[in-house]
Amino acid sequence: LSFYAQEYSRTGFQGGLNWYRSSNSHENKQKLELFSGIKITVPSLYIAGKQDWGSYQRPGSLELMEKHACSNMKGIKFVDTAGHWVQQEQPEQTFNYIESFLTSYI
């Protein structure tokens, strides 16, 4: 926690906020329309924290992602006791899911 406090006091929270700013800009929405309807066809794995509200804010969105965006979805993993920052909150469990997924293709 002290690391984050030190970094935010040095840089502010600009890095984290810039993603949200850019995703809401009209110019970037037009650029992203180029990818509309394109599917991710490589094997994919969705990992999220079980306490991250983002996975639950739109019921059915994970199923829609599997059906329309990721045609080769191999799994959905929820990490217990993790929220939005799953890789920072539970790095070992996150790594284990990624390692297991990748080694299944070697």
Where are these regions (language model features)?
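Alpha/beta-hydrolase
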Residues: L1-R58
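Alpha-helix termini
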Residues: K29-F35, E66-C70, I106
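Conserved loop-alpha-helix segment in the C-terminal half of the alpha/beta-hydrolase fold
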Residues: L45-A82
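Catalytic active-site module of serine/aspartate enzymes centered on a nucleophile-bearing elbow/loop
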Residues: N72-I106
